[in-house]
Amino acid sequence: MAVPKRRVSHTRAAKRRTHYKVTLPMPVKDKDGSWKMPHRINKTTGEY
């Protein structure tokens, strides 16, 4: 069973977690020219 030999300090854990970045999806232009988020329904045209 995998058990750590030593406790990981708060600083060390925080340094490791700095690489877990969240990237936001970029908005795309719809057929009517409005910007929307991808994979969302446009309320005016009803397109996905």
Swiss-Prot record:
NCBIfam families associated with the record: rpmF_bact
Entry keywords, A to Z: Ribonucleoprotein, Ribosomal protein
Annotated gene: rpmF
Record-level GO cellular component terms: large ribosomal subunit
Protein name from the UniProt record: Large ribosomal subunit protein bL32
Record-stated family: Belongs to the bacterial ribosomal protein bL32 family.
Keyword Membrane appears in the UniProt entry: no
Segments of this protein annotated with the region Disordered: 26-48
GO annotation, biological process: translation
Record organism: Campylobacter fetus subsp. fetus (strain 82-40)
Xref: InterPro entries: Ribosomal_bL32, Ribosomal_bL32_bact, Ribosomal_zn-bd
Domain of life: Bacteria
Alphabetized GO MF terms: structural constituent of ribosome
Pfam families xrefs: Ribosomal_L32p
